[in-house]
Amino acid sequence: MFLSRVNPTRFPPFVASRRLFSASASAASLQQYCTEKPPIKPWPQRLFPKRLVSMITQQQNIDLALQIFLYAGKSHPGFTHNYDTYHSILFKLSRARAFDPVESLMADLRNSYPPIKCGENLFIDLLRNYGLAGRYESSMRIFLRIPDFGVKRSVRSLNTLLNVLIQNQRFDLVHAMFKNSKESFGITPNIFTCNLLVKALCKKNDIESAYKVLDEIPSMGLVPNLVTYTTILGGYVARGDMESAKRVLEEMLDRGWYPDATTYTVLMDGYCKLGRFSEAATVMDDMEKNEIEPNEVTYGVMIRALCKEKKSGEARNMFDEMLERSFMPDSSLCCKVIDALCEDHKVDEACGLWRKMLKNNCMPDNALLSTLIHWLCKEGRVTEARKLFDEFEKGSIPSLLTYNTLIAGMCEKGELTEAGRLWDDMYERKCKPNAFTYNVLIEGLSKNGNVKEGVRVLEEMLEIGCFPNKTTFLILFEGLQKLGKEEDAMKIVSMAVMNGKVDKESWELFLKKFAGELDKGVLPLKELLHEISVS
């Protein structure tokens, strides 16, 4: 049997990491957080554990939350910590990845007298939070130390640990822990445990072994469920083996399990990724025939596939259907549909989609606004783009990306006065321009023959500490060349070098340009080399 192939590994009482929950480190680590006076005012005259839990939970500052906890235990007359107060502070600290005080407090909890009776939920929370921080080894140590606190480990903590190991891609350890669960930990796996093992095997692309686990589950007195089958089906889909995935679907049906929206969506996603869109559409038809409602993920998979296939009309129709069913599409999906419509020269339809989203209380964000502004400007409809921007600005704060997109469109159309007004609006909103913002403005000025003003903008760019790049210098050099003022190029180089704002690519541009023109006697290379030597 597959499940018995791994030799049982003894997990002895944990002695390898005595630093974890070490009492010797506890006092010193927490001393810096202790205060003689109440850390917050007003401090309650009467304090009960429930009130303290509320104070800790509501406190946004992690250090202050810990100070409140310590002051209550050491300085408030008659107050004694209990399991709930420890749980609240340990959860808050571990969630914020403040692990040093966590380990010190755990040492205090373990050594408390009289002993504080703990529950398993505390350890489950710690397992999760250490795992989310990528510290799966610490999660394993915590799991092994649970009995030290007078708590019996259950299948819940085992399943939490297995999930942590999967999140951290330690699939080999999942099988080892599963195999040793009963003998070393006294825990009998349940179907959720088996599903986690199946998931780990599928993640490491060992679907054949996952299938063997599926076959052996009944011998453990358990019944494979929909999640078991869907996980294996997803494994085949990830491999691109759609025929095997279909066989799993048929086996599910034969054994009396009816696929849900997730199962169908996984199958559809596999077909879409392989470009087999018609088969994905057939799966969606089957789904509806079986009276299974698609969810937001189902719609997302199909809409993205339609956009990729350049079928903007069908994507728009499905998007409308999604909104009608009260599903809220995410920003990236909206941008996909807007892009597909605009690439198909349906900018008006894209604007209509924007208005429909507003009507459905689905507030567009900066990414979506920037996408639509980009296409409106590309079509030469800068005035409409500005109106859209103003409409958005009434209820939201435009991002730098949104400002950059509209400024670029205005500069491209030669509407420099409007671009300047928008620039001023940026400053009023304390939205700091970046190299791209300066580049589009400099390019707009240069294209309109106002290179002198472009150089002034470069000076401002250098003054605020924004690094020009190769593109910035190319724009100005080309502008000077058109005006027959190439001799002024060295002044720009000197200005940049004096401010220490020249990157490697820009230096290469300078050397290539000026070394190539040395023989013409236009720009002396010696000047450039001198600038480099003194910078």
From Swiss-Prot:
One of its GO terms (cellular component) is mitochondrion. PPR repeats lie at residues 82-112, 119-153, 154-189, 190-224, 225-259, 260-294, 295-329, 330-364, 365-395, 399-433, 434-468, 469-503. Its main location: mitochondrion. This is Pentatricopeptide repeat-containing protein At5g16420, mitochondrial. The keyword Repeat applies. It comes from the Eukaryota. Residues 1-28 form a transit peptide. The keyword Transit peptide applies. Keywords: Mitochondrion, Repeat, Transit peptide. Belongs to the PPR family. P subfamily. It is found in: Mitochondrion. Pfam families: PPR_1 (PF12854), PPR_2 (PF13041). InterPro entries: Mito_RNA-Proc/Resp (IPR051240), Pentatricopeptide_rpt (IPR002885), TPR-like_helical_dom_sf (IPR011990).
